[in-house]
Amino acid sequence: MRTKTLSLFDSFYGKISPSMFYRTIAAIYLFDFLDRLRARKYPRDWYSILERELDGLISNFSFFDRSFDFSANDFAAWSETDKNFDIEKKTGKVYFDLWKNFGKEEFFAQALSALKDRFEKNGISVSSVNDALDDGCGSGRYSFALKRLGCARVKGIDISAEAIELARRMSPFPADEVSFTQGSVLKLPFGDESFDFIFSNGVLHHTKDDKKGLKEIYRMLKDSGRCWLYLYGGKESLFWDIVDLCRKLLSTVPQGYTQSLMRDMGYPPGRIFHRTDFFYVPLNKRYFASEVEAMLKDTGFGNFKRLKRGVQYDWDEIIYENPGIDPYIFGEGEMRYLVSKK
C-alpha cells in the first residue's frame, strides 16, 4: 500500500502549479486529510477516498485558473533569504514564531491538561520530584505544567533566546521555583546528576546529534531519577509520507505566508502550530521502536518502558481506541518512553 500511495503522491505533485497559493492550499488540505479520516473512524477504504479527494483538488485548482487572474500578483514580499542557517537556531525560530501567537489561557491550559492526562494514563507522578529539567523547553508551557503537577523546582533550557524571553515573561512563578536558560540540549550547562526528572518532549529528533543529546540526559540524571522521552515514531507511515509531500510542496513557500493563510482561513493558533511544526522545522527524524531502544541501551540506560496511552489526538491513543486501523496510517505509533539508569 505504501508503494501505491507514494506513486499517487508523485503524480499529484507533478500536477500542482508552482504558485505559492496553490502549493500552500494543497499542503494544508493534505495534512487535514488525516483529520477527515479520524472523523470517519479510519475506514479501510481510505486510499480510494484519498485518490478521489486529490483528483477533486486538482479540478478545483483548474476552476480557479479559469476564474481568477493571478498573473499580476506579487509574492516578493514573502520571500526569504536565509538559505544558509544554523539548524538549532532555525528550529528555535520556527517554534518561537508559532508560540508567540498563543493567548495566555491557551498557552497554559492546553499543555497542563495534556500532560496531566498523559501522566495519569501511564501511571506517572512527579509530586515527589525536587529538581526537574525541561530539556528544550521552548516557551515554557510544559515547564509551568510540570511545576503545577508537583515538581518543587523546574529549570527550562532552549536554543532560542526569543523563546526564553517569552517564557520568562509568561511565567507566573518566582525565579527560584521556575527558571529559564538559553543553551543547547547537546551541551547543557548543568552539573552531573543534577535532576530527579528530565522532560525531553519532542526535541532530540530536531537535532543534528540525537545520541549526544541522550548522553547529556544520562549525565545529568540522578541514579534514582527518571526521564520522560518523546521522539517521533511512525516511521514509513502514511502520516510521514503526507508530511514529506507537504514539505516538498512548501519548500519554496515562506513560513509566514503559510501561517497568514491559515489564520485567514480561520485556523486557531493550536492547529496552526501543529501543522507548521511539521512543515518547517529543518530536521524531523523518525524512529522505529527498535532504533530508540538500541540508542537507549547504547547510552547506558538500564531501564525503559514504552508508554502507549495519551490524549485523544495522540497516535497511540488513536491506535488504542481503533484496534482495526490500517497499520500503515500511523505505523508503530509514537515513541514515548519512561527511562531510568537502573
Residue ranges: model-predicted function:
Residues 226-258:
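Conserved class I S-adenosyl-L-methionine
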Residues 275-291:
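Acceptor-substrate binding/catalytic loop of class I
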Residues 211-223:
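A short glycine-rich, Lys/Arg-flanked "PGG" loop and its adjoining helix->strand segment in the class I
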Residues 197-208:
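A short SAM/SAH-binding and catalytic strip from SAM-dependent methyltransferases
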Residues 133, 139-186:
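Class I SAM-dependent methyltransferase SAM/SAH-binding core
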Residues 105-128, 145:
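Conserved alpha-helix/loop element of class I SAM-dependent methyltransferases that forms part
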Residues 5-100:
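N-terminal, positively charged/glycine-rich alpha-helical extensions of SAM-dependent methyltransferases
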Residues 186-197:
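A short acidic, Gly/Pro-enriched loop at the edge of an enzyme's catalytic core
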